[in-house]
Amino acid sequence: MELGKSMENQTDVMVLLAKHVIPTVANGSNLVFSPMSINVLLCLIAAGSNCVTKEQILSFIMLPSSDYLNAVLAKTVSVALNDGMERSDLHLSTAYGVWIDKSLSFKPSFKDLLENSYNATCNQVDFATKPAEVINEVNAWAEVHTNGLIKEILSDDSIKTIRESMLILANAVYFKGAWSKKFDAKLTKSYDFHLLDGTMVKVPFMTNYKKQYLEYYDGFKVLRLPYVEDQRQFAMYIYLPNDRDGLPTLLEEISSKPRFLDNHIPRQRILTEAFKIPKFKFSFEFKASDVLKEMGLTLPFTHGSLTEMVESPSIPENLCVAENLFVSNVFHKACIEVDEEGTEAAAVSVASMTKDMLLMGDFVADHPFLFTVREEKSGVILFMGQVLDPSIH
């Protein structure tokens, strides 16, 4: 299997995840999550798992072997690297944080992976007696690495979970990109947005009179909005069904056809007779561990699945802890804002481990649609979601 095909598989897996989250956790609400963040966390968990658990994770994310796991990890992580100058109109960063109980230490191979492949910051903490401090530390870390967009990934309600934890792995993604062709704010006006229940809300719509990357397909159309570029290329894609209530049908089609997103990329700019996109801003959070288990990924959440992460040779009574580690919870939170200037978005994933084409067209996004933000060269999907009601912030 080529690396490119492996990356495409990651996209298909995350589309299936979206299909599962939308009718259950996100039922009737706007949705945004980061496939990149969740995928990297799963790869990291796989690297510290026993053979049987690792095989299930590899099968779940459609990778044939650990060699491909390492290659996909390197490719995904490299998307955030920028060899050029820092710029104010384009920024993507990822960060990795680890909190390990003071009674444990990392196995050398896993420590090497954390420090050299992920450049992770590692912290020793006291989960049992100071869980509130750990929660505050993780939340402060998340706030710093999302530029203040996500101030809380662990709530006070999670204190029992944290008290029983021995290890926390976290990933944060932050993206800010300016449109390559910005919208003129003076042209932004309020129009009706048609909800799935047939009602309408007034929301501000952006427009311009430039040619757009737009392509028509049977039952839907796809818009590609590029951001400014460095050596990487980022774009937002909006998948708009022709029917105002057609989003569920479109989602079913997207999730049932492999490579759908990769096979529906507008390549040509065309003139538009009508072009309107709503501004939107919202956040979404869910317990990803529940969704992953419902989708069949169960072994990481069973006793003794994470045998390659930690050790405690100097404290014999803790040996069973190192051998019986498992994932207790995976929390995920993301937010996004789209306006005339561009897009700002962020996401955090936290896993706690416990011992136990036309010449002229139109694109008026005045009813529910799907969207993605992706890096074009690698195909990595940074963010994915649905907009049901852009008036809800």
From Swiss-Prot:
Cellular component terms per the entry's GO annotation: extracellular space
Which InterPro entries does this one have? Serpin_CS, Serpin_dom, Serpin_fam, Serpin_sf, Serpin_sf_1, Serpin_sf_2
One short Pfam name that applies is Serpin
Keyword Glycoprotein attached: no
Q: Annotated site (Reactive bond), which positions?
A: 356-357
Q: Which family does it belong to?
A: Belongs to the serpin family.
User: From the Swiss-Prot or TrEMBL record, what is one GO molecular function term?
Assistant: serine-type endopeptidase inhibitor activity
- What keywords does the record list, in alphabetical order? Protease inhibitor, Serine protease inhibitor
Q: Is-annotated flag, keyword Nucleotide-binding?
A: no
- This chain belongs to the protein called Serpin-Z4
- Domain-related comment: The reactive center loop (RCL) extends out from the body of the protein and directs binding to the target protease. The protease cleaves the serpin at the reactive site within the RCL, establishing a covalent linkage between the carboxyl group of the serpin reactive site and the serine hydroxyl of the protease. The resulting inactive serpin-protease complex is highly stable.
Instruction: Tell me the function of this protein.
Output: Probable serine protease inhibitor.
Give the span(s) annotated as RCL. 342-366
